[in-house]
Amino acid sequence: MKLKEILSMETKELILKANRMTSNLKLDLCSIVNAKSGICDQDCKFCAQSSLYNTGVKKYPLLDKESILEKAKEAEKMGAIRFGIVTSGKRLTRKEILKVAKIIEFLKANTNLKICASLGVLEKDELRYLKENGLDRYHHNLETSPGFFRNICTTHTFYDRVKTVENAKNVELEVCSGGIFGVGENFDDRLELAKILKDLEVDSVPINFLIPIRGTPFENFQKLDVVERIRTIAMFRVVLGENVTIKIAAGREDFGDFQALAFFAGANGMIVGGYLTLKGRSYDDDIKLIEGLRELMRW
């Protein structure tokens, strides 16, 4: 199927096609910790952590290993198999990278979780060092298409992000990379992003839907409706194929009663336990959803 043909498919047809491609996939749950908050000089217009916007976000330096382990233990209790260390800012200092490496070692010794990290722009030698200390997967979103990127960020480029993904692939780390939707882009932008992620051979693609945050330039943006969200997920599954994990992440609670439909439309993973600066769904609600999905999808 030609990529452009996907855009013209009826929603039901697209969902059914995506659903057939997820039949052999397992449910993949992950959780993250906001390990360093605020203090970011980048201008990503959707993000609460940019110091350029007055969002009231908490600001703190890199957490200690005991605090991060506590969050990891909570994630493990919720059934997560992966745990991500996420820091604000374009990149970490060498000193901070050394500290994160020690934290990764500590988590691997005290949990059964696979450890992921999202630390901004890193070079190959830095990523290799983290891998040698136990890092399993690196996360770095491309966010949107190259042509639309300057509408959401001007302090770095789309290709800065691509380079980091390539660096992680080159040192044989697994890679998680996705985007944010509902920031003014169209379906052509989404399709182009999906194609680029496929060509980069990433392992996991998080699908984030904009949660407008007061104080950011996008605070008055309207949230995407459920049908457009479902079409986006299904389109990514059809483009990416059967072997890539697609996770619904930020904004998934806005699906309301239709959240399970995202999994029939191609998703096979989600972030549990909240996001960087916002709470997600409650633990009890997520457990009910997970149990229902496992029964319905035989996960």
UniProtKB/Swiss-Prot annotation:
Gene3D superfamilies reported for this sequence? Aldolase class I (3.20.20.70)
- Please cite one Gene Ontology biological process associated with this protein: biotin biosynthetic process
Q: Which residues form the Radical SAM core domain?
A: 22-252
Q: Which reaction does it catalyse?
A: (4R,5S)-dethiobiotin + (sulfur carrier)-SH + 2 reduced [2Fe-2S]-[ferredoxin] + 2 S-adenosyl-L-methionine = (sulfur carrier)-H + biotin + 2 5'-deoxyadenosine + 2 L-methionine + 2 oxidized [2Fe-2S]-[ferredoxin]
- Pathway membership, UniProt: Cofactor biosynthesis; biotin biosynthesis; biotin from 7,8-diaminononanoate: step 2/2
User: Per its Swiss-Prot or TrEMBL entry, what cofactor is needed?
Assistant: [4Fe-4S] cluster; [2Fe-2S] cluster
> Organism's domain of life?
Bacteria
Note accompanying the cofactor annotation: Binds 1 [4Fe-4S] cluster. The cluster is coordinated with 3 cysteines and an exchangeable S-adenosyl-L-methionine.
List the EC numbers from the record. 2.8.1.6
Binding-site positions, [2Fe-2S] cluster: 116, 176, 247
Concerning InterPro entries, the annotation shows:
Aldolase_TIM, BATS_dom, Biotin_synth/BioAB, Biotin_synthase, Elp3/MiaA/NifB-like_rSAM, rSAM
Where, by residue number, does [4Fe-4S] cluster bind? 40, 44, 47
Please name the GO terms that the record assigns under molecular function: 2 iron, 2 sulfur cluster binding; 4 iron, 4 sulfur cluster binding; biotin synthase activity; iron ion binding
Query: Which chain regions cross the lipid bilayer?
Result: none
Q: Which family does it belong to?
A: Belongs to the radical SAM superfamily. Biotin synthase family.
Among PANTHER family, the record links this protein to: BIOTIN SYNTHASE (PTHR22976), BIOTIN SYNTHASE, MITOCHONDRIAL (PTHR22976:SF2)
Function, as annotated, reads: Catalyzes the conversion of dethiobiotin (DTB) to biotin by the insertion of a sulfur atom into dethiobiotin via a radical-based mechanism.
By what name is this protein known?
Biotin synthase
Q: Which organism is it from?
A: Thermotoga petrophila (strain ATCC BAA-488 / DSM 13995 / JCM 10881 / RKU-1)
